[in-house]
A protein has these predicted regions:
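Residue-level signal for pocket-adjacent positions within structured domains
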Residues: 5, 102-104, 115
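Active-site nucleophilic cysteine motif
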Residues: 9-29
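...with weaker cross-activation on analogous glycine-rich loops/strands in unrelated enzymes
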Residues: 38-103, 126
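Surface-exposed patches in mature extracellular/periplasmic domains of secreted proteins
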Residues: 14, 32-37
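Secondary-structure boundary/capping signal
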Residues: 29-33, 103
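Glycine- and charge-enriched low-complexity intrinsically disordered segments
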Residues: 107-127
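Active-site-adjacent structural segments surrounding the nucleophilic cysteine of cysteine proteases
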Residues: 1-8
Length: 127
């Protein structure tokens, strides 16, 4: 079976931020998203990949009007020149995410994370 969404160990290309988004949509909505995970630091400048910026639309996410709601995906840019991190908004303005080198966790969505947000998106069948 799958690991729980909280307190997963971080393993790049396996248990990482996109892996958590994949699991959230599979467990919560029965939606299978495309698996873009790779086991190298693709967000570093020497790599051409830019998965979040280039793939969100083809993966089924859409921009929306109105306020964000639980289940929306947040794409962030954290200590990189590319959009390199994602999480899921939860009830109570919480963010479910899995940061490099940390256990997956829920944190308040504001301040640091909100300032680094590039897009908030909703899966097309949930719009």
């Amino acid at each position: 079976g799958e690991l729980p969404l909280l307190e997963r160990p971080f393993v790049l290309g396996h248990f990482d931020c996109w892996g958590l988004v994949l699991s959230y949509f599979r467990q919560t909505h029965g939606i299978e998203l495309h698996d873009y995970r790779v086991d190298y630091p693709w967000w570093e400048d020497q790599y051409p990949d830019n998965f979040y910026q280039e793939c969100w639309f083809e993966c089924g996410f859409r921009e929306f009007t109105g306020p964000p709601q639980p289940g929306d995906m947040v794409i962030m840019q954290v200590q990189a020149n590319k959009w390199n991190h994602a999480g899921i908004l939860l009830e109570g303005n919480m963010l479910l995410h899995h940061l490099y080198g940390h256990l997956s966790q829920r944190v308040p969505y504001g301040g640091y994370w909100q300032e680094r947000t590039m897009k908030v998106l909703r899966y097309k069948s949930l719009c």
